[in-house]
């Protein structure tokens, strides 16, 4: 019991002496730097993905890619249209709606403002479309001070044929394989009787208006045009020249015939024969119903 109490009483003094000696030794061997402080770094690891990507994300990515491709295509188209516009060329190559009409009208007005003394070439390859949009283009063609030369290629049908005939007389042409079609405006009505009556009056107004415009473009009578547009009437370029809707056919580097435009010409004849002797094909004794 005495030994145990002696050792336990000596142990604290022994430990403190060892600590004092070690601290003094370390302080004497390694000088303590002043103001030494290490800033702890905080490691941030990305969260682990526990689920697969949503299909909606891939759908959005594909939509963005398609929109980018469409924007690139539209940009290329606008570049082409811009180059054509520098050459005073306007191209109508689609169905006619309000958006297309706004583009065509703005280009015509721009070119007319830049130089009203130079011709504007309006190329047409269109199946027609909205009558109101077509009337807007027609009015602008008549409004501009510059001569508008219309050139049909492919097809100029329905309301597009009105724009074709609206060009400056003597400067309305078509390519050899173009098809041209005129007809009366389409329309329909439903609902109450009074609504049907109102729509019917509007359709008749549009029909009379279109008939008057075609008669003015072709120098034909109102009654004759009214009869001709009762059904779809397709024409070749030569037949369109005969009808008075255009003034010549572009065949290579030549335009035939341009002057004079015969009033009565047999249809479906060789272009070269007409250019050599157009008077030979004049047949005033044949009535219109047999010619067309």
UniProtKB/Swiss-Prot annotation:
The keyword Ubl conjugation applies. The modification N-acetylserine is found at residue 66. GO terms for cellular component: chloroplast; chloroplast envelope; chloroplast stroma; chloroplast thylakoid membrane; chloroplastic endopeptidase Clp complex; plastid; plastid stroma; thylakoid. Ubiquitinated by CHIP. Keywords: Acetylation, Chloroplast, Hydrolase, Plastid, Protease, Serine protease, Transit peptide, Ubl conjugation. Mostly expressed in leaves. Also detected in stems, and to a lower extent, in roots (at protein level). Induction: Repressed in darkness. Levels decrease in leaves during aging (at protein level). Slightly and transiently repressed by high light stress (at protein level). SUPFAM superfamilies: ClpP/crotonase (SSF52096). The active site is at 158 (nucleophile), 183. GO terms for biological process: chloroplast organization; proteolysis; regulation of timing of transition from vegetative to reproductive phase. It catalyses: Hydrolysis of proteins to small peptides in the presence of ATP and magnesium. alpha-casein is the usual test substrate. In the absence of ATP, only oligopeptides shorter than five residues are hydrolyzed (such as succinyl-Leu-Tyr-|-NHMec, and Leu-Tyr-Leu-|-Tyr-Trp, in which cleavage of the -Tyr-|-Leu- and -Tyr-|-Trp bonds also occurs). Disruption phenotype: Embryo lethal when homozygous. Its main location: plastid. Its EC number is 3.4.21.92. GO terms for molecular function: ATP-dependent peptidase activity; serine-type endopeptidase activity. It is found in: Plastid, Chloroplast stroma. Residues 1-65 form a transit peptide. Cleaves peptides in various proteins in a process that requires ATP hydrolysis. Has a chymotrypsin-like activity. Plays a major role in the degradation of misfolded proteins. Essential protein required for chloroplast development and integrity. Essential for Embryogenesis. Component of the chloroplastic Clp protease core complex which consist of at least 16 proteins: CLPP4 (3 copies), CLPP5 (3 copies), CLPR4 (2 copies), ClpP1 (1 copy), CLPP6 (1 copy), CLPR2 (1 copy), CLPT1 (1 copy), CLPT2 (1 copy) and 3 copies of CLPP3 and/or CLPR1 and/or CLPR3. Interacts with CHIP. The core complex is organized in two heptameric rings, one containing CLPP3,4,5,6 in a 1:2:3:1 ratio and the other CLPP1 and CLPR1,2,3,4 in a 3:1:1:1:1 ratio. Belongs to the peptidase S14 family. This is ATP-dependent Clp protease proteolytic subunit 4, chloroplastic. The lineage of its organism: Eukaryota, Viridiplantae, Streptophyta, Embryophyta, Tracheophyta.
């Amino acid at each position: 019991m005495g030994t145990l109490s002696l050792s336990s009483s000596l142990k604290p003094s022994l430990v403190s002496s060892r600590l004092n000696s070690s601290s003094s030794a370390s302080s004497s061997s390694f000088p303590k730097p002043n103001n030494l402080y290490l800033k702890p770094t905080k490691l941030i690891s990305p969260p682990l993905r526990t689920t697969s990507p949503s299909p909606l994300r891939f759908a959005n990515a594909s939509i963005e890619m398609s929109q980018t491709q469409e924007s690139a295509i539209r940009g290329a188209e606008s570049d082409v249209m811009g180059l054509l516009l520098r050459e005073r060329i306007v191209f109508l190559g689609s169905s006619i709606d309000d958006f297309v009409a706004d583009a065509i009208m703005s280009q015509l007005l721009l070119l007319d403002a830049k130089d009203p003394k130079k011709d504007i070439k309006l190329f047409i390859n269109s199946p027609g479309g909205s009558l109101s949009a077509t009337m807007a283009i027609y009015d602008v063609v008549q409004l501009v001070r510059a001569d508008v030369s219309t050139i049909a290629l492919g097809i100029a049908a329905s309301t597009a044929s009105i724009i074709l005939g609206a060009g400056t007389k003597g400067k309305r042409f078509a390519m050899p394989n173009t098809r041209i079609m005129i007809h009366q405006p389409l329309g329909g009505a439903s609902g109450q009787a009074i609504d049907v009556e109102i729509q019917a009056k509007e359709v008749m107004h549009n029909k009379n208006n279109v008939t008057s415009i075609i008669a003015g473009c072709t120098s034909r009578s109102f009654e004759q045009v009214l009869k001709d547009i009762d059904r779809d009437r397709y024409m070749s370029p030569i037949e369109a020249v005969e009808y008075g809707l255009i003034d010549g056919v572009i065949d290579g580097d030549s335009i035939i015939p341009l002057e004079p435009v015969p009033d009565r010409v047999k249809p479906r004849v060789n272009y070269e024969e007409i250019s050599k002797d157009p008077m030979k094909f004049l047949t005033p004794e044949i009535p219109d119903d047999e010619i067309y």
